[in-house]
Amino acid sequence: MPKYFFHLAGQLPAHDLLGLECANDKEAKDHGSFIAHRIGTEKPGMVREGNYISVTNEHGKEIFQIPLASTTV
């Protein structure tokens, strides 16, 4: 299975060094969305324009940008 990486981009960037094997791009996007919502919910101060999860493939090509989002009310 191909490996994908889920980097935090924006104000406080963090690089995913381990990555995760996913069956395809859709599964990687779904996992990136999960991460974006989890960070947004646990750290609502991070939800702002310019902060997002950058999903890259094993060749380093960015395939998705997923904005951080909070599910808290």
What are these regions (language model features)?
Residues 6, 28, 53-55:
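Generic recognition of well-ordered secondary-structure surfaces with a strong bias
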